[in-house]
Regions:
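Pepsin/retropepsin-fold aspartyl endopeptidases
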Residues: 1-147
Length: 147
């Protein structure tokens, strides 16, 4: 149920079914570097992915207008091998905020729809496993100390 609790500064989305267990999802509206709107998409939350947003190659093509030079592409180490990622600048809109982000896709292979820690660490997120909700909370006021 998107927008659940929106009056309280909270946006929530239901987990998606997985093969064995459901997994958390977030919905973001994406724009390329020219600020052309791609639209709103659902992305699987992946805390094991250190990067920003990964998309399949076909979807990444929309963002190629902001692609960085090859010397700035990133390489990640997986259990099996290393993966080189093409990287493009973009803007993500989530919970009323616009964030400058990078979109990645594997140089070889298909890619997936993921949101990784580079973006997640910039948001206040609640993963409510028992209720199968993923929520973005309102940003904490400046100067507030959560302790």
């Amino acid at each position: 149920m998107a927008g659940r609790g929106a009056g309280a500064g909270i946006e929530c989305w239901s987990y998606a079914p997985g093969l064995r267990l459901p997994y958390p999802m977030l919905r973001l509206r994406l724009y390329n570097a020219a600020l052309e709107e791609y639209g709103e998409i659902a992305l699987q939350v992946d805390t094991g992915y250190e990067g920003p947003i990964m998309l399949p190659r076909g979807e990444y093509e929309f963002f190629m207008i902001g692609e960085l030079p090859r010397s700035l592409w990133r390489t990640y180490r997986t259990l099996a091998d290393t993966v080189t990622m093409r990287v493009a600048r973009a803007v993500a809109e989530v919970a009323g905020r616009r964030l400058e982000v990078y979109i990645e896709t594997p140089l070889y292979g298909g890619g997936k729809r993921l949101v990784g820690r580079e973006v997640l660490n910039r948001l206040r997120i609640l993963l409510d496993g028992p209720s199968t909700w993923a929520c973005i909370l309102a940003q904490q006021p400046r100067g507030a100390n959560p302790r």
